[in-house]
Amino acid sequence: FSPNSPSDVARCLNGALDVGCGTFACLENSTCDTDGMHDI
């Protein structure tokens, strides 16, 4: 993930919680939000 954009990481983590995705997905810079939405 990009350590130079902590705000983006924070938003990603918040989004991960909303879609029930693991925080590790955000840290690995995956399409957690998209996959989570499709799962739901």
Curated annotation (Swiss-Prot):
This is Stanniocalcin. Its main location: secreted. Disulfide bonds: none annotated. It is found in: Secreted. The keyword Disulfide bond applies. GO terms for biological process: calcium ion transport. Its primary function is the prevention of hypercalcemia. Upon release into the circulation, it lowers calcium transport by the gills, thereby reducing its rate of influx from the environment into the extracellular compartment. STC also stimulates phosphate reabsorption by renal proximal tubules. The consequence of this action is increased levels of plasma phosphate, which combines with excess calcium and promotes its disposal into bone and scales. Glycans are attached at N29. Homodimer; disulfide-linked. One of its GO terms (cellular component) is extracellular space. GO terms for molecular function: hormone activity. Belongs to the stanniocalcin family. Produced and secreted by the corpuscles of Stannius. The lineage of its organism: Eukaryota, Metazoa, Chordata, Craniata, Vertebrata. The keyword Thylakoid does not apply. InterPro entries: Stanniocalcin. Keywords: Calcium, Calcium transport, Disulfide bond, Glycoprotein, Hormone, Ion transport, Secreted, Transport.
